[in-house]
Amino acid sequence: IAGAFVLSASIAQADIKPAVVYDIAGKNDQSFNEAVFVGITKYMNDTGIAVTELEPTNAAQVEQSLKKLASRGYEPIVAVGFAMANAVQAAAEAYPDTKFTLIDMVVGLPNVQNVLYKEHEGSFLVGVLAAMNSETGTVGFVGGMDIPLISRFECGYKQGVNWQDSSMNVLANMTGSTPAAFGNPSKGGELTRTQIQNGADVVYAAAGGTGSGVYQAAADAGVLAIGVDSNQNWMQPGTMLTSMLKRVGEAAYDSYEAANNGTWEAGFRILGLAEDGVGWALDEYNRDLITPEMEARVNEARDAIIAGDIVVHDYMADSSCPI
């Protein structure tokens, strides 16, 4: 399988043989996959245990990669992204004694740990920031693939915008209807330019690698953008308002750590603001854009969500958005 390599020779010292299969966007997508890669790199540095990494280049290779690793005794095997669900189902059925951890989707088998996130909660927070920074009264959203998971980001964002200012207008577009929509920066830029022409002065991208085109278009027009998954503030310093953090790297790290100490469990881990699974990024790249008032307001919203005083509607619960 293309992209297979071992980063360290220390694996013989470990009780586990951890592995990961990235999705076809690859671990250098500067977004979702890269966030997992960062977490895995930290695990290797912290423990000295090598993690075998496979990067399939097409959908057919995903199942092959998972089965290849399982046949060679690797576990737990982390599968990155919703698109891997069918492949994980097949591999986990074929290798029922192998532990699999699936990020962002559900496979209901006794050897699969499913890690899910409350993206709507994190998106609510960046929606508050978008509303506080807009001067036109219009903000934008560019999603990747048109699926319920991405609509969850969009709906949470809209609720945050509305909570801060109910008079705001939110423009929203999806990039496409296949997984390729997460790797199309030119289309992302095109959609963003259209939104800007229609008045948007803050644009949130939940689109994987497509986001780089969104951020470039925003920077070119002198408007603000919001990143996703990993901290993308560095990509366009000065126009990146923040990033909605989805701590998927920690999911991989925790899976390996739990397997190594005997506490790994199949089933579900659902991570929101209360679990620090999602959040927003504040660092040297956007510090000057975030006023004390903005920071206080976002923290107010965060605390209210954790306390249950604000309930952010989950689009995936009923395929609807109240905003």
Residue ranges and their predicted role:
Residues 1-2, 12:
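Cleavable N-terminal signal peptides
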Residues 7-14:
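Sec/Tat signal peptide C-region and signal peptidase I cleavage site
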Residues 14-323:
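A residue-level marker of the well-folded mature domains of exported/periplasmic proteins
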